[in-house]
A protein has these predicted regions:
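Non-ligating segments of multi-cofactor redox enzymes
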Residues: 1-270
Length: 270
């Protein structure tokens, strides 16, 4: 469990997307090629990707004292699960926990997509192209999995997204403090008429590194209340078979196909 945690308060988010911009700038990520079009959740870009690690989504939420819906806005990134599916299914051990955060070693990643299939939050994605910054450093590596690293690789004391949030919707502190804050906010929201207000991230996958204050039930935000865990017995057997295949005269493409299909089966069974 990470000693510290993010706090996302959906009731305070203004949808300014400063967090998206800060994440792009600090990590040197390229811009998405998008159209001037509001998607189903009025988002742009449409989702998290290998080059977009922070995403702001708009959801309609009903209030008990109003006849019309209002918008609630949610900041989304990797949830940094204490016991992440992505780590458990990775055949190359390219995913690990660093100071409590879930990070990917692109030098070990073979781009099989096992982590993509296993994540119920649809966070990691395989990059479709290489991208270097002005200094010539590889920021994005083609056919490798990428996602939020909680700014651990850049050794920031406060993650970039949190440092620029103007409304206090994003906080970063010791996890117990974030949980206490979240529970108090839920009490306030219920008093304001949000009868279904709740805290998300307390128990899912052993506890998440992102604690979220919701104004409605988790499913309204596409968040599973009881997300499925990977069957570790099957996962270990799959890794054993993968290890045997990797010692044989099989190329990377064949190994990638095996890992991808196996992970889809594990995700389906979960």
């Amino acid at each position: 469990m990470a000693e510290k945690a993010f706090l996302v308060d959906t009731s305070k988010c203004q949808g300014c997307r400063a967090c998206q911009v800060a994440c792009k700038q600090w990590n040197g990520l390229p811009a998405e090629k998008t159209e001037f079009f509001a998607g189903p959740e009025n988002t742009n870009p449409g989702k998290l990707s290998a080059i977009t690690w922070n995403h702001v989504i708009f959801f309609p939420v009903d209030r008990s004292d109003e006849s019309r819906p209002i918008w609630t806005i949610m900041h989304k990134k990797c949830y940094h699960c204490a016991d992440p599916n992505c780590l458990n299914v990775c055949p190359e051990k390219a995913i690990s926990k660093k100071d409590g955060w879930t990070v990917i070693d692109q030098d070990k990643c073979i781009g099989c997509g096992a982590c993509v299939n296993a994540c119920v939050y649809n966070v990691p994605e395989i990059a479709e192209f290489h991208y270097k910054n002005d200094a010539g450093q590889h920021i994005i590596k083609k056919d490798k999995s990428h996602k939020c690293n909680a700014c651990t690789l850049n050794e920031r004391e406060i993650p970039a997204c949190v440092s620029v949030c103007p409304s206090g919707a994003l906080l970063f502190d010791y996890r117990n403090k974030m949980i206490e804050y979240a529970k108090n906010r839920v009490k306030e929201l219920k008093a304001e008429g949000f009868a279904n207000a709740s805290v998300y991230g307390l128990d899912q996958y052993g506890g998440l590194g992102v604690i979220t204050v919701l104004r409605d039930r988790p499913e309204k935000y596409d968040l599973p209340l009881n997300p499925p865990a990977v069957d570790m017995t099957k996962a270990e057997k799959t890794k054993d078979v993968y290890a045997l295949l990797s010692t044989a005269t099989m190329g990377i493409p064949m190994l990638k196909r095996f890992a991808y299909k196996a992970s889809k089966s594990l995700a389906k069974d979960a």
